[in-house]
């Protein structure tokens, strides 16, 4: 009986490890698919670019940059995409993130409803672009933060899911 109990105990300890490993493999595969769809929808290669998402007290920032400052094709593709999404987001159209992530990201419903209380401003930066998102509406702000936290997690950027106290632009 003790031998059986010992074996059962060892198996019980092993189950969470197998479960965690399976979860990691699933997440890695999911991020690979997100990047593949992103390359297609956004028009630039995620292997040649860096994506960042920042939460700000009044909204947030979506930023993409070419890794190589001489990669003019990636820089121009990023800029084209960011001009496009700032215009679409301003109209309440979040179909691109839905296509990339294969689901509607959290916060999108509220951001669509409150689109007139949110600004999406495109800025070119040295190696790419950013979209600055701002609002004074507390419900819109929560939705923006939910949206950006989802982006951080689903893209696996490693960006902080906490609000940065620095307000730029």
Predicted regions located by residue number:
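Intrinsically disordered, low-complexity terminal tails/loops enriched in metal-binding residues
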Residues: 19-169
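Sec-dependent signal peptide recognition
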Residues: 2-10
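N-terminal signal peptide c-region/cleavage motif recognized by signal peptidases
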Residues: 14-16
